[in-house]
């Protein structure tokens, strides 16, 4: 924005245009406190270890007081009511576990889910309809993925553990427990 100054003389009017000058000054307020990160209340601490993230983990459920049901939420915000609606509408499973594994270099942000399913026996897969009658979680093989993957009733694809375990070898003594084989170099004559 240009500033215009009008200079009037006795017979004519002249207009001068001067560009505005912008001066940047450092504020003299509390600089140390302003440099700290301040989290708003809507930022979630996913792992409850002071590691705040702006993204909510895909399965985040806020902590509730002991004995408090999802209907008796003390927080009146719409977010908590949305979470309780989500749990009621999606048949929330209390055994549902969720973890992230960032330690493995070869995996791209490995992500795993566990729902209290039993993957140990192949009989569990073939008898999934029988297991559902008994109240157990049913698993079925997906048609489009590998035969080692399973789909639970929640629609999650679970991978079977492909590691082949080596049979355990018998324990042997360590270097400190081994006894050296001494050969008797002195021959004792046998008396006849």
From Swiss-Prot:
Report a single Gene Ontology molecular function: protein serine/threonine phosphatase inhibitor activity
Feature: compositional bias, Basic residues: 157-169
Q: Basic and acidic residues composition bias: which ranges? A: 25-49, 86-103
Regions of compositional bias (Polar residues) in chain numbering? 134-148
GO CC annotation: nucleus
Query: What's in the keyword line of the UniProt record?
Result: Nucleus
Source domain of life is Eukaryota
Q: Where is the protein found, in the record's own terms?
A: Nucleus
Residue ranges under compositional bias (Low complexity)?
Answer: 8-18, 69-79
Q: Which family does it belong to?
A: Belongs to the YPI1 family.
Q: What does this protein do?
A: Regulator of type 1 phosphatases which maintains protein phosphatase activity under strict control.
Full protein name:
Type 1 phosphatases regulator YPI2
Source organism (scientific name): Scheffersomyces stipitis (strain ATCC 58785 / CBS 6054 / NBRC 10063 / NRRL Y-11545) (Yeast)
